[in-house]
């Protein structure tokens, strides 16, 4: 529905920002991971969004990267996890640590998020284990993963963005891995 919102930051709260978009103030709920990388009030920002429509109104949830939005949507697909629970997880667990925890079956790493108990964490692991990337896969030398990761970090991407972009990529060289990852990040 609304792919993203770009505008001037008018207000910053504990779990939201208000973005002025053509004279309309849009309240966007964001995880702490997004909040800490936003520019200050008065600056322009772009957030990828998820629109939740309910009987009593609607809410917009925003994320600095498409990867965060994608993980948020995957979390919402888990029975018993709503937008606030998904935001809670994304606020305290990075994407790469989340993927590692789910693939390792480490429910304790997820229970650090407020409102996420043992049963919910176990359900998240059960339902998302096959929907998340396992790890970076290369056909040749395994040092490619580290070199490709370092290249993406040098280009200004965060570690979690770079790991997500390199996940499940099969290639023969560092150059191919970086090219494929950049294509994934540009989508």
From Swiss-Prot:
Tree of life domain: Bacteria
Any Gene Ontology CC annotation: cytoplasm
UniProt comment concerning the protein's domains: Has three domains with a flexible linker between the domains II and III and assumes an 'L' shape. Domain III is highly mobile and contacts RuvB.
Free-text function comment from the UniProt entry: The RuvA-RuvB-RuvC complex processes Holliday junction (HJ) DNA during genetic recombination and DNA repair, while the RuvA-RuvB complex plays an important role in the rescue of blocked DNA replication forks via replication fork reversal (RFR). RuvA specifically binds to HJ cruciform DNA, conferring on it an open structure. The RuvB hexamer acts as an ATP-dependent pump, pulling dsDNA into and through the RuvAB complex. HJ branch migration allows RuvC to scan DNA until it finds its consensus sequence, where it cleaves and resolves the cruciform DNA.
HAMAP family linked: DNA_HJ_migration_RuvA (MF_00031)
Gene: ruvA
Keyword ATP-binding (UniProt): no
Region (Domain I): 1-64
An MF annotation (GO) of this entry: ATP binding
Keyword tRNA-binding: no
A Pfam match: RuvA_N
Native organism: Thermoanaerobacter pseudethanolicus (strain ATCC 33223 / 39E)
Record's protein name: Holliday junction branch migration complex subunit RuvA
Family per record: Belongs to the RuvA family.
Region Domain III, residue ranges: 140-187
Subunit structure: Homotetramer. Forms an RuvA(8)-RuvB(12)-Holliday junction (HJ) complex. HJ DNA is sandwiched between 2 RuvA tetramers; dsDNA enters through RuvA and exits via RuvB. An RuvB hexamer assembles on each DNA strand where it exits the tetramer. Each RuvB hexamer is contacted by two RuvA subunits (via domain III) on 2 adjacent RuvB subunits; this complex drives branch migration. In the full resolvosome a probable DNA-RuvA(4)-RuvB(12)-RuvC(2) complex forms which resolves the HJ.
Biological process, per Gene Ontology: DNA recombination; DNA repair
Residue segments, region Domain II: 65-136
Record keywords: Cytoplasm, DNA damage, DNA recombination, DNA repair, DNA-binding
Region (Flexible linker) location: 136-139
Compartment(s): Cytoplasm
